[in-house]
């Protein structure tokens, strides 16, 4: 987007990111969950069928007729924020935004051909200017990442699942895809939270917005550190029963829990990756075609391995212990059958040392490099 196409620029000095690729802020779990979704049996068939059947024109006409379109004449302050967000993230076409009457605090980016951003009156009335700016940036991040297509399909399939629930086994296949879509969408929220921070460039505003979405407009009664401590307590969880309950609680949700989002975003804001973006060093869109899919897979795998290794959740700890135990057992079996242990005793020192030492020596640095910068927080309001 050229500077001349914007009469409005950010109200205070904010960094702009010309040509930024969504890869710069996408959470590794977002990418890997989308890969898993695309590999799900039947997803491609459903996706292609729905792409031609979904009444997108009807959807646009519905918002046009029953919501307020943001413009210079209506909700001008939101219009300024929207144009600012597109300017900062260099989104060439400003998507239409609508304000819908709804007391629930919510925002979404939907649409198959072109994204549409919708925010509710409940959200507009709840947040101050800088908090709302993070939300608008969050939704523009969804648009830049192309999330609106899958979000639209998720909404449609969720409604369809209710209508066909009476058909034997008719609901099973649909719910399998819906569950996978929800898992991906929860991860995509972490990416969009990061985009919101890049637009607002105010971590405190992002934290305040998330706290308000969780606890309402009583900011004087809330504390960021205490709120983040809740996320830590939630992750630690208690015992394995609590871990299972956490999984069951999150399955029907399209968004991660608010405290988790706040903790993820705060963590990312303190990483070297975030600072590099702010310094102008980030992946660019014109490089996307050259980006290695295998590198993306490795980064995602590294992220999950690091998550299991560092998680305080009892179930994750058990998984890590089992994986670590299996690794130790594998090493012992390898030495047993290759004579690695005996060779060390018998004097074939160089061979044994090279064979056993090299993997051990390279695994550590590789793991550290892989995990660096991939663990990420997130942030921007719950339903945003």
Give the positions of each predicted feature.
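Hydrophobic or amphipathic, alpha-helical segments that drive membrane association/targeting
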Residues: 1-108, 275-384
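Short pre-active-site segment immediately N-terminal to the catalytic Zn-binding motif
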Residues: 69-73, 77, 118-134, 180-187
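Short helix/loop segments within enzyme catalytic domains
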Residues: 73-79, 85, 89-91, 169-237, ...
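Divalent metal-coordination and catalytic microenvironments
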Residues: 82, 119, 138, 192, ...
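Active-site His/Glu-centered metal-binding helix of metallohydrolases
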Residues: 127, 136-145, 191, 195
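Catalytic Zn2+-binding segment of zinc metalloproteases
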Residues: 140-159
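Short hydrophobic membrane-inserting alpha-helices and related fusion/pore-forming segments
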Residues: 158-174
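Extracytoplasmic and endomembrane cell-envelope/extracellular-matrix remodeling and assembly machinery
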Residues: 212-253, 264-294
């Amino acid at each position: 987007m050229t500077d001349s196409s914007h009469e409005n620029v950010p109200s205070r000095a904010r960094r702009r990111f010309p040509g930024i690729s969504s890869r710069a802020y996408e959470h590794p779990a977002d990418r890997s969950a989308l890969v898993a979704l695309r590999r799900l049996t039947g997803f491609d068939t459903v996706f292609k069928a729905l792409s031609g059947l979904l009444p997108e024109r009807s959807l646009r006409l519905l918002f046009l007729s029953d919501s307020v379109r943001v413009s210079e004449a209506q909700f001008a302050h939101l219009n300024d924020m929207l144009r600012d967000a597109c300017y900062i993230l260099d989104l060439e076409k400003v998507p239409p935004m609508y304000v819908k009457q709804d007391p629930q605090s919510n925002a979404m980016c939907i649409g198959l051909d072109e994204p549409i951003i919708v925010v509710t009156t409940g959200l507009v009335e709840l947040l101050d200017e800088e908090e709302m700016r993070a939300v608008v940036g969050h939704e523009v991040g969804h648009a830049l990442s192309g999330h609106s297509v899958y979000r639209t399909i998720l909404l449609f399939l969720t409604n369809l699942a209710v209508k066909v629930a009476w058909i034997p086994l008719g609901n099973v296949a649909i719910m399998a895809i819906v569950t996978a879509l929800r898992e991906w969408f929860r991860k995509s929220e972490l990416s969009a939270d990061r985009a919101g921070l890049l637009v607002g460039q105010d971590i405190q505003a992002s934290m305040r917005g998330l706290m308000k979405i969780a606890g309402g407009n009583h900011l004087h009664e809330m504390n960021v550190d205490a709120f983040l401590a809740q996320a830590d307590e939630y992750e630690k969880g208690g015992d394995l029963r609590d871990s299972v309950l956490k999984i069951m609680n999150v399955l029907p949700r399209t968004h991660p829990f608010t405290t988790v989002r706040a903790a993820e975003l705060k963590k990312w804001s303190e990483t070297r990756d975030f600072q590099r973006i702010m310094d102008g060093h980030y992946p660019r869109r014109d490089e996307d075609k050259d980006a290695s899919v295998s590198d993306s897979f490795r980064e995602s795998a590294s992220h999950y391995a690091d998550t299991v290794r560092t998680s305080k959740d009892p179930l994750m700890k058990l998984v890590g212990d089992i994986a670590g135990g299996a690794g130790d057992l594998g090493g012992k079996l390898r030495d047993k059958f290759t004579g690695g242990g005996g060779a060390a005793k018998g004097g074939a020192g160089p061979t044994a040392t090279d064979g056993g030492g090299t993997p051990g020596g390279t695994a550590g640095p590789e793991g550290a490099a892989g995990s660096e910068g991939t663990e990420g927080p997130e942030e921007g309001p719950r339903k945003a």
